[in-house]
């Protein structure tokens, strides 16, 4: 058979050889015929097409396929990565792909193509939620729904974005910034939630370089200056620890250094206000053992060797993160008196930690797939909940921005299961996350065995126990402190179902109680001038009865009405503008 004319270009030939070599290296027991047939189809279909950099276009899908190979995606996923642009950008049809590679590949290619057709996000997820950017909402909704149908679609899309970020230099400046911001706000958090950490940190560092070039350069130079010193310390720490583990009988153990990523250093400088020269924990070790019980043995030997730092130990083996991540984390004072972070895990745990949900497709049998399968099932359930709770794309985006892209806390149920919730969540958020019916009848909570107010913010590692009563009802006050959009929507839905008269009465009582708390007389509600001035601030409210009803339904905040009345009855001087700190990165 005559070779495709695309192979007249040495760069395309080199790309094909690179793919074949990597496939044989990582999958020596697999036949590469279908993979190379997909390569040939992609080369032929994209023949004559070039990237902005001048490279033959087919080098892009090849690089995407190589990233997917590294992520341990299955062979159909690799083929789909090679063909992910052919239906959209060439004359190749679905029928041709189906005839040669089967229905599974067609479904994957179509899934990625639909994402490509989606409208680009115009700004960050959080900004889009605040501005209610409909196009952003539609795009993100499409992306997450595609992900829930087949996670491999999202893995291919992440690989596609990673290669585009690696080759961003040929783009105009404004487009680079837009793509980098979108990557930082959407794709990096998605990679994190899928547990694909090696993709997450690369996306963050590449985005950081574009969005904050000055700070990127400064941190890169600072890291370079101290590199030799750190490498010497790292080598010595690895040698000392490996010798100790060997002497204790852990012979088949890897001890490797793990670099701190530039964006994580930048975050520490910005969020904690620590000058770079005072960041000492730039050294991190990873210990990889054969069996789970050896993780705990190794932990004991590490703590015997070096002094552990109090309060900085986490056990994600007995209580895995919801995305399936398992490892022991500890921080110790190393041989030179500087903090060293140590992570201890088995090889299988390491696969999951590095490759996230993609590891699920590398294993088809036994327990190794169970943790990953449960994580995928939980993710699909969350996406379904967001869709069911949201009446439109804007609400969906707001829910995802709050519940998915925000920082998370990990807490325990009484049975020891782990739930992830948005940072700042309360026992009420926890209750609704477990089950809506449980949230509706919650009357109290215990955290770590101690009774606490329902507005208490949960911390990592908290064990939460709920107190319920069958005849209990939710409170409108909960809307003032719940953090998750899921809990908020369920509480509002409960009050919307009540009849209008009851909601009107409930809303009026709630406002009167809040006015008393603020030291105002409830008669402020009957002052026509005050009420009319308050009404203009609330959309879709025609009269005071409407206002009471919407408060009773949970659609308007009790506090917002009371504060408006307070401003009219007892106006206060405007607050003084607050001054800025001295952190050199404050404006970023």
What is each residue range found by the language model?
Residues 288-290:
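Short hydrophobic/aromatic beta-strand micro-patches
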Residues 35-37, 41, 46-83, 87-96, ...:
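Alpha-helical phosphate/pyrophosphate-handling elements in metalloenzyme active cores
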């Amino acid at each position: 058979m005559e070779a495709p004319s695309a192979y007249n270009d040495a760069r395309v030939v080199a790309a094909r050889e690179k793919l074949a070599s990597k496939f044989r290296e990582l999958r020596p027991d697999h036949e590469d015929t279908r993979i190379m047939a997909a390569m040939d189809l992609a080369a032929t279909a994209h023949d004559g097409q070039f990237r902005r950099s001048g490279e033959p276009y087919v080098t892009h899908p090849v690089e995407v396929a190589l990233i997917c190979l590294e992520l341990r995606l299955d062979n159909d996923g690799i083929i789909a990565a090679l063909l992910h642009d052919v239906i959209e950008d060439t004359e190749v049809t679905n029928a041709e792909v189906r005839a040669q590679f089967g229905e599974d590949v067609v479904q994957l290619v179509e899934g990625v193509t639909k994402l490509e057709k989606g409208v680009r996000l115009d700004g960050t997820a959080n900004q889009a939620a605040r501005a209610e950017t409909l196009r952003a909402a539609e795009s993100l909704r499409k992306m997450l729904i595609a992900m829930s149908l087949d996670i491999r679609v999202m893995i291919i899309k992440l690989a596609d974005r990673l290669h585009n970020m690696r080759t961003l230099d040929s783009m105009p400046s404004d487009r680079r910034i837009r793509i980098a911001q979108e990557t930082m706000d959407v794709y990096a958090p998605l990679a994190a939630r899928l547990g694909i950490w090696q993709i997450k940190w690369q996306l963050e560092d590449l985005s950081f370089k574009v969005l904050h070039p000055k700070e990127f350069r400064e941190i890169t130079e600072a890291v370079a200056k101290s590199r030799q010193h750190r490498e010497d310390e790292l080598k010595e720490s690895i040698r000392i620890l490996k010798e100790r583990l060997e002497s204790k009988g852990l012979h088949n153990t890897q001890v490797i250094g793990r670099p701190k990523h530039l964006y994580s250093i930048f975050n520490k400088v910005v969020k904690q206000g620590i000058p770079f020269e005072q960041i000492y924990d730039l050294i991190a070790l990873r210990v990889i053992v054969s069996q789970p019980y050896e993780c705990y043995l190794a932990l004991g030997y590490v703590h015997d060797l070096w002094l552990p730092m109090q309060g900085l130990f986490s056990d994600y083996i007995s209580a895995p993160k919801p995305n399936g991540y398992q490892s022991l984390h500890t921080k110790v004072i190393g041989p030179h008196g500087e903090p060293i972070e140590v992570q201890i895990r088995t090889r299988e745990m390491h696969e999951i930690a590095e490759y996230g949900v993609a590891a699920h497709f590398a294993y088809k049998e036994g327990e190794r797939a169970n943790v990953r399968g449960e994580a995928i099932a939980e993710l699909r359930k969350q996406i379904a909940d967001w869709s069911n709770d949201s009446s439109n794309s804007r609400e969906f985006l707001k829910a995802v921005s709050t519940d998915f892209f925000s920082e998370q806390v990990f807490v325990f149920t009484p049975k020891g299961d782990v739930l992830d919730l948005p940072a700042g969540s309360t026992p009420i958020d926890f209750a609704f996350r477990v089950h809506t019916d449980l949230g509706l009848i919650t009357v109290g909570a215990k955290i770590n065995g101690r009774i606490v107010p329902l507005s208490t913010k949960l911390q990592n590692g908290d064990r939460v126990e709920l107190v319920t009563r069958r005849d209990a009802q939710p409170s409108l006050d909960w809307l003032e402190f719940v953090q998750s959009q899921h809990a908020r929507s369920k509480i509002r839905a409960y009050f919307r179902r009540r009849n209008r008269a009851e909601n009107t009465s409930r809303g009026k009582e709630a406002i009167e109680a809040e006015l008393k708390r603020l030291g105002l007389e409830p008669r402020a509600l009957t002052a026509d001038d005050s009420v009319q001035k308050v009404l203009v601030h609330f959309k879709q409210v025609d009269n005071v009865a409407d206002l009471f009803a919407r408060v009773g339904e949970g659609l308007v905040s009790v506090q917002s009405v009371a504060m408006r009345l307070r401003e009219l009855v007892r106006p206060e001087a405007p607050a003084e503008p607050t001054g800025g700190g001295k952190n050199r990165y404050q404006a970023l």
